[in-house]
Amino acid sequence: MLQSEKEFDYINIKLASPLRILQWSYRRLPNGQFIGEVQKSETINYRTFKPEMDGLFCERIFGPSRSFECACGKYKLIRYEGLICERCGVELTESRVRRHRMGHINLIYPVAHVWYTNSRPNYMALLLEVEQCEKNLNTSWQILRFSLPGIYDQVLRPILLSDHWPDSSIDEYLKTICKDFSTIALESSNIWAKKSKAWYQKIFEIYQELLYAKIETIYQFIEFIDNIDLTKQPTSVNFIFDYLENEKILDLMNPISLTNEITASQDPAQIDLVDPSRDIFLFLNTFPKKQHKELFRKLIRKSNTVKSLDDRIKRIKLASLAYFIAEDEISYYGLHWDLQQYRRSRELGFTAYPLKPEPKPKLQNRRYNTPKYLLRMTPTYLIGAVLIKKELEDLDIIKEIQRTRKFIVICSKILHKEKPIYHFLRWFRKWELQRAYKLRDQAIKRIRILENLLATGSNPAWMILTILPVIPPALRPMIQLEGGRFATSDLNELYRRIITRNNRLLRLLEIDAPQLIIRNEKRMLQEAVDTLIDNGKRGKIALSANNRPLKSLSDIIKGKHGRFRQNLLGKRVDYSGRSVIVVGPSLRLNECGLPYEMALELFQPFLIREMINQGLASNMKIARNLIEQNEAIIDPVLEKVLSNHPIFLNRAPTLHRLGIQAFEPILVQGRAIKLHPLVCSAFNADFDGDQMAVHIPLSLESQSECYMLMLAPYNFLSPANGEPIILPSQDMVLGCYYLTVSNIKGLLGSNQYFASLEDVLLAYNQDKIELHTAIWIRYTDNYIEPLNFKKQIQLNDASYIEIYENMQIRRDKDGNKIVQYLQTTTGRVIFNYTVQTTLNLLS
């Protein structure tokens, strides 16, 4: 078997496309047959103990169970290597190929990846600009929560509205909506009763976005019945329908750009998306109930001649019109309202969609009935992962990035109340400030996702799975135990559920089963895929036969015992050690205390080489003997080796890149690693028994990277948010406060005079003064303006002393300054001396 070694600088992780998943598993046999799809849920034959063909352990897909032996037994020798059996189709090769050959499952119905629908933040919600998407994208995968009782039982089969509805169905529905329906519908119908000359004279534009296609429909009333007495006008169905058609209410061929209209508008605050629509359909409700039945029939028949870009759009729009005519609570605020709100948020995004969702208008006290018949018009492809996939496919990543960037700039200007944006968009004042900040943060998260998708060349629609990869069988083994029993991986059970439900869904579609059963099967398929990817992510944990949680793919790779931390990051390596950490406040940020015994063992090869170079030993054996005897000549050589060789310190778990940092080692006694307390926050370490690992960089390149990139002082800012990560802790702040306190009186050695900082430290070490003793120290560097003059003392040599509140200045007879003393405390001297020593300010 050929093996190739390739050098690479980095690994690029991205979404896998359906084509890439097929490339992982699809292979073509010499007879022209394509293999790779797992079609059966069986694993092995319990009589022959051989893998089932096209099953989860199929030898034709994943390779032979025994090296150079086909499934049927026709070929068994190594001389047939590379041959494909013409009887069973198994390639004669080594059995270890079962560790990397993959298969796939063609899903009958697309399913959403649970990592992106139930994540925090919700990636699909950010991409589609739908708030609270995690509540909408549940296992039934209805992106629109209709909030209607019994919706799952009512939506049975899609019915084309363009077809002629049975009269019996229309009669039954109209009896429902017309029951107790008065001629005067709402307050607006009082005008009808009073025979007003002009009901409305108003020009407005109403934008109604519909879900499945990128088309906006404009409903217009232009010069509505100007100065016309409604009582003198014919009220026949023909008049109503002709009026609706003439006024272009039913014109479905008027797509407009809502974004452009709002941008061009001089006063966006006047755009009303609710009341004008209600006014239109309240007008329809002013006609007597006996005319509704005929009006409905005419609308349905006329729909055959209505031009539309797509039959689906026509169906939804006419259904919406029927809802409004019904003036029902659920019809007005049910399906149509959710369609409108979702499309508005999707098309306009956060730029023009109100930051505070529009509340549903209040209705009058009436009896409402659920229009079950109209609910059945909802096509099956308007719900589920198919719809989400369609919306994600329509995303133009480059345009979305540009639009989101503009919104972030505009939102920032509004939050800072910059002119003229803030005053031009007066309607922003109605929005809650916290919500504005929240949406700007969401836009920032969204642009990060979009830029990552663009950089990796990924399509967001790949978050919806149409082809499910099957990992190699050697990674999910089935082992035979004593007594004929088998121990198998949980992944086999999870894959078996998916294949079983997928095949059952295919069978239901072939026999044209009721939609209720098909939808339930789609839900079960989605749940099975969710459990395979991440069991428990949805909230419900799938259990095995003995009530044990099944181990999913996510459980295998995450956690302390997962593949990364257990087998990759936690491997034992050479030139490494481990010990408990203790505090070392006297160290610098770039230093750490390395125990002598550990340094002697870790740096032994470097130590031997240096001893040979200095002539202390003639060969490795003599040098090793000197080290074992712990001769005194070893110490200076070891210090020289350590002076130019950094080390890595790592604390598990390594959750971010600051979990591994470089330090310059300092030899210390004992067996514990000393660490500066300020660098503990990056490691998330404390001194209650934590352990850290030491690693030695061997090559010159790695050592140069330590000095240039990974030293602790160079990791001052957090890579996550740019905030300082090296900050003084509470005990440090309290210690600095206690060190510099100056209001304690009556202490040992008060009011003594000192010539320098070193004299103060010497007196403190000899216990002649205390930490908070008030002292006078000579100060000669810079002139300080004295304050609060108290008195002046004349001396015999004509000089005099000026005494201030915290200063004493001695001057000669001409007024020239001879010397000055500052009043301070011993603790402040220690603090000042430490700072100057660290900054190399002392001469």
Curated annotation (Swiss-Prot):
Its ancestry begins with:
Eukaryota, Sar, Stramenopiles, Ochrophyta, Bacillariophyta
Native organism is: Trieres chinensis (Marine centric diatom)
- Keyword annotations of the record: Chloroplast, DNA-directed RNA polymerase, Magnesium, Metal-binding, Nucleotidyltransferase, Plastid, Transcription, Transferase, Zinc
* Recorded catalytic activity of this chain's protein: RNA(n) + a ribonucleoside 5'-triphosphate = RNA(n+1) + diphosphate
SMART domains, alphabetically?
RPOLA_N
- Tell me the residue numbers annotated for binding Mg(2+): D686, D688, D690
Instruction: Write the protein's name.
Output: DNA-directed RNA polymerase subunit beta'
| GO CC terms in record | chloroplast; DNA-directed RNA polymerase complex; mitochondrion
Annotated residues that bind Zn(2+) are located at C70, C72, C85, C88
The similarity comment for this entry is:
Belongs to the RNA polymerase beta' chain family. RpoC1 subfamily.
